[in-house]
Amino acid sequence: MRKNNIVLIGMPGAGKSTVGVVLAKKLGYRFVDSDLVIQEQYGKLLHELIQEHGVEGFWKLENDVNASLSQRRSVIATGGSVIYGSEAMEHLREIGTVVYLKLPYEEVVERLGDLNARGVTLMKGQTLRDLYEERIPLYEKYAHRVIDCHEKQLREIVHEAAAVL
């Protein structure tokens, strides 16, 4: 399958959805938010699915949905935890160019604010710093390209992301 999608990964607050919408408009592509696809498929909000299935159970649902995406000419914004699903990540790498929107920890904290309101779920005893340090190697492992978003304007990030095609 030809890689004509752009898949955005990164921490919550990195700007995946914001960059995704603007990038899709620039390229004339569809925009897909995989969190919304999950909610639509299961008929529940993400936090309801997490309450019902637990964090790891939610990761399984997320993996299954992302592994079955079949979009073409789309910008796909994923949930921050998509990288825990190896099946999903291998599939996304096959159907698109995976772009990691990288931010320093301090900027993630600044952008996120209230973790619960943003749907960021931490394991018992885990801090946001722990989560950040756990995920960074996974984002880097799966990314075809890394865009350092620190102190960059939206248009600069979109321009860099469009150049991956």
Model-derived regions, located:
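Hydrophobic anchor at the beta1->P-loop junction of P-loop NTPases
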Residues: 8
